[in-house]
Each structure stands twice: as structure tokens, then as C-alpha cells.
A protein has these predicted regions:
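Extended, subdomain-level signal for the structured scaffold at the beginning of enzyme domains
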Residues: 1-62
Length: 62
């Protein structure tokens, strides 16, 4: 499992492009909102994260 952490003011393209490429490659990826489930990027675009920070399963990390 790969966690992509998203915080307020993140660069949308820098988050979405790698997320797309990883998922196309078959990598299991979850987006994680640091400041809640909905996170707003630098251009005001809201992204609903898969998880909030407290929901991460740290036992699945390698």
C-alpha cells in the first residue's frame, strides 16, 4: 500500500499525475487527507481523500 498524503494548498497536478500513474501500474494507492477528508489544493480544487490521517494502517507499510 502506498499512501499519498494531501495537505491544504497541495499542488493538484503534482498529486494527481503520480496517483494516476501508480494506479495504472497496478499499485494500490490511497489518498490521505492530513486536514480532514476533503482537502483543497493551491487552486481551490477540493479533493475527497480516501482516508483521513488517523485512519492509516501503519502495519501495512514496508
Amino acid at each position: 500500500m502506498v499512501y499519498l498524503l494531501l495537505g491544504t494548498g497541495f499542488e493538484e497536478t503534482e498529486a494527481i499525475a503520480p496517483l494516476d500513474l501508480l494506479r495504472r501500474a497496478g499499485v494500490e494507492v490511497a489518498t490521505v487527507g492530513i486536514n480532514g477528508k476533503v482537502v483543497y489544493g493551491s487552486h481551490g480544487i477540493g479533493i475527497e481523500a480516501d482516508l483521513e490521517l488517523g485512519q492509516m494502517d501503519l502495519t501495512s507499510l514496508e
